[in-house]
Amino acid sequence: RASAAGEVGKIKMENGEDIFSPAREEEVLANVLEAHSKYPNALDVNTVRAVFREIMSGSRALQKLLKVTYLGPEYSYSHLAAIERFGQAVEFVPVGSITAVFEEVNRGHADFGVVPVENSTDGRIADTLDMFMRMPQMIICSEIRLQIHHNLMAKCEAKDIRRVYSKPQAISQCRNWLGKNTPHALLTEVSSTTTAAELAQREPGAAAVASRQAAVRYGLRILFEDIQDSADNETRFAVIGHQKTAKTGNDKTTLMFRIPHSPGSLADAIAVFKSNKVNLAWIESFPSRIAKNEYIFFADFEGHIDDPKISKMLKAFNDECTEVTVLGSYPIAQISG
């Protein structure tokens, strides 16, 4: 396989084709999982996915070592999402903000970036939507849906915890549990779950809410697992870059659009999806930076920009809007983690 991957890489380079092909990788994985389903006593599905993720990652690296930037530091949930999508055989570059992720990709310092878009508990990630407004040339070429598992970790015993560190979103997602189980601890917000784990490592009486991987990295003991208030806590991430993704037949498209500031304009725009029998999966409004009291809308719908049905729908949709930007079409991700 390694030899074949190297030859494929040469052909791709000669033809100017993309090394990272989400559509092709989804096709390979779907075939593997279909074959796997025929063996009832085989490995767990998540194990099979992880193994083939690394095989594809290693094969990609033989063609070109990709550079992927993410909202750090190491072992943040953005890092875990990046590993889930690209495997370990890439050069990961942590940066300090979502803005920096976009800038690194835009300047060509990284091939791809991984940014959070939406959490099932806390909703949209405003910084990410804001950067799409600032850099609409960025293309979403893949998505990752990561099940978020928050854990309470420390070097001390649970009864000795006086302070709990984590990022604001993690504290928010575990607030009820923390209130019941660590009522005397001071909840302290920091920049990331990894920073929280680092502080818990060196500060007596401190604990952190973070991932299992962060506990291993900083030598902390997990006192309680899965402490998030919602069992279905999930974050959706976007992979941004400069390349478009081919259709797979199981895709979604993300739009950014502006509508006239008049009664019924949003209803008229949304009606286009219904009349063309296109499933609208997500819509979010965001204050415009151009005009006061005007909003930019983001939307996900099922289908690919290259589908004739979608092309027809977008023509009608454009007629109802003052501006439409297609941020990308990409395979619909299955939840992992």
Regions found by a protein language model. Give the residues of each.
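Domain-level signature for soluble enzymes in the chorismate/prephenate branch of the shikimate pathway
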Residues: 1-337
